[in-house]
């Protein structure tokens, strides 16, 4: 039969091993890693501000809660700096202002970040305004702006102090607070006209703003928020993120709604005339501009409970409001519905419109956010709601009617020391809060309130509350596990006795902080430097396994199912157990967001499963389910044109020692980055029925699929043509040298002649617009990746023996069993390199799935492995 006839050839064959075959796979590709640490937000009341600041020595951003403004007159100080900084040869001009605010019961109404111990922008040690709280003293006064730098608080110089010193200066400034601030001078606008030709990908940009949907508070203009790769705007090159759209053809976009602007743009013809307003100067290397978030930087975001158009409640995440003279990052969720093309993935922008209007926010309400700094500590968490810092939205528009959270800071303070009864009704997100504690009898504390969850909507719980009892079960001395079990098993209606204990909670935080510091010191002293922080991370990964949320009983809230090969946008990877993510579709991020198991959780559970499997398995029996962690020594697998086999001795050695060469690697998620390619991707199909699939693709689509010409040292026969049948190599030594230099993706020897498929042969086909069908082993996948010819690698995974025998009726049951086992081993060996795994009960079903995968993965934008660490 098919396989048996080649077994007789084994003794005549020897294999060329590449030097890197036995080395661990590190995807030796040219990749960049961008790990830019972004600021974090802590929302606290004025009363316990100093306590939490003492605990959070590493906090990057603090909240000064809102109150009323003073009627103090405006005092403008026009002093200038002694030395004017230069950027790209241009002077950066600043203006200075002294602003007097009257503090009320809750604070000054703005947030700050920065300091000498944790600079907010570049290496600048200044204290910067990061948010103006609506309704607060600063907002009502109207002069303080986001990105203003505070130089002095009353008579205290804070131009070069630590973050905690600045907070202390603000806290102790008294009821009348004089702020001396520095800001960039507003940049004027230049009007230009741009002519665009739509083309197949449309105009290629996204917009935000409009009447009732202001992108910049107080400004009804329509702004460009994204330039899409391959679209008309990108090809033209003049339209930029941050440009203000003034006119489309003969239609003015001044004082129009968001919907009207969208309709005007969508109803244009092939030629579109735009009139746009541009900043006169953009400092491309401005040290005071925020870091590039195109890669892994995550700006501080806050959850807002919004009222949707259909009357239902939804969540929306907003960035700190944009100030004049500043660049502002634009989050993807603001760009979903109004793209005029189908972008393959969300692209984040860092340049925004610069205007001279005050930037105090008017349409956003703060929601208390847990910094989740405990997530990396050696204390377990029980998540009753979604993880903090979520991005949840179902509309691209930026503003709808906001709903004030019912829990106010003033009320939180008044609840201190009073045990109180809280009745909650579980919703789709559980109870909507997280707990920590339960070690050494320290108590169970609320560490996070999910915006819009039952706890938040009730307004009766807050961060720092100690849970005394749940449905009559005393939790004052309970362990974390006991508290989690009590909450999880409490039914739909849960009665909680809680007591606000800020001092106890602060001591608990301090304890965790000390433990983290000890862990950090130990990690650094041991040289590992691998201690992971709790900072919110955003990245893209490729799933290396199937996940069904309905089968995971441990989900803390709404889960997200996915398949092997799916690209996931991980919005928050700060938690050790659960990540927040969306699937990345062809048109961008999916609206559906949920939690997925973290890399750590996946690997831990799989190792536990494998231990059980090995414990229960009989000696010498291989798990037929084929767990995805098995990794064996790489070997050449049969190719119809090149039968590259191991020699008999090698085969017997590996058969007798099945665990030899196995690496303890569990496939969970692979970090990826998006890349544009200018070639047609090669196609490698592995698994049963691959030959028939390959033949059908070339037969049905000869204009889209082809094969490359292999090399050989075998003498040319009379009927053969050099360059058509083979590239006939005269010098065996030269071909051996080329093999050693990795110029071949696969090579071997048969009857004393060398055969091989060269990278150049594959590239020749790929650059001529055809998918090169390759009948090679899984080893070739990585070698093509190294050559930056990223193949579409599809693995056909049989469901069971029956479909195999049905699709190939010549197979006996024994042969089908061997084919099935070979497929499982193939997945174990090369699973990390597959683009997709397909399954089907019929050949037609498998063929159609393969065609769909190839169509979706053809490019020009593809996801490739990156070196970012998980």
UniProtKB/Swiss-Prot annotation:
UniProt PTM comment: Palmitoylation of isoform 1 is not required for targeting to postsynaptic density.
Ranges for domain Guanylate kinase-like: 680-855
Gene Ontology CC entries for this record: adherens junction; axon cytoplasm; basolateral plasma membrane; cytosol; juxtaparanode region of axon; membrane; neuromuscular junction; neuron projection
One GO BP: retrograde axonal protein transport
Statement: the UniProt record of this protein carries the keyword Oxidoreductase: no
Residues that bear Phosphotyrosine: 58, 505, 750, 755
Bilayer topology term: Lipid-anchor
CDD domains, alphabetized: GMPK, PDZ1_Dlg1-2-4-like, PDZ2_Dlg1-2-4-like, PDZ3_Dlg1-2-4-like, SH3_DLG2
Localization in the cell: Cell membrane; Postsynaptic density; Synapse; Membrane
Domain PDZ per the UniProt entry, residue ranges: 98-184, 193-279, 421-501
Residues where lipid is bound covalently (S-palmitoyl cysteine): 5, 7
Phosphoserine sites (modified residues): 28, 65, 307, 328, 360, 365, 406, 414, 528, 530, 553, 627, 635
Keyword list, A-Z: Cell membrane, Cell projection, Lipoprotein, Membrane, Palmitate, Phosphoprotein, Repeat, SH3 domain, Synapse
GO terms of molecular function: guanylate kinase activity; ionotropic glutamate receptor binding; kinase binding; protein kinase binding
Location of the SH3 domain: 536-606
Keyword Lipoprotein: yes
Role played: Required for perception of chronic pain through NMDA receptor signaling. Regulates surface expression of NMDA receptors in dorsal horn neurons of the spinal cord. Interacts with the cytoplasmic tail of NMDA receptor subunits as well as inward rectifying potassium channels. Involved in regulation of synaptic stability at cholinergic synapses. Part of the postsynaptic protein scaffold of excitatory synapses.
Subunit details: Interacts through its PDZ domains with NETO1. Interacts with NOS1/nNOS through second PDZ domain. Interacts with KCNJ2/Kir2.1 (via C-terminus) through one of its PDZ domains. Interacts with KCNJ4, Interacts with FRMPD4 (via C-terminus). Interacts with LRFN1, LRFN2 and LRFN4. Interacts with FASLG. Interacts with KCNJ4. Interacts with ADAM22. Interacts with DGKI (via PDZ-binding motif).
Membership in a protein family: Belongs to the MAGUK family.
Comment text on domains: An N-terminally truncated L27 domain is predicted in isoform 2 at positions 1 through 27.
Name of the protein this chain belongs to: Disks large homolog 2
Organism from which the protein derives: Homo sapiens
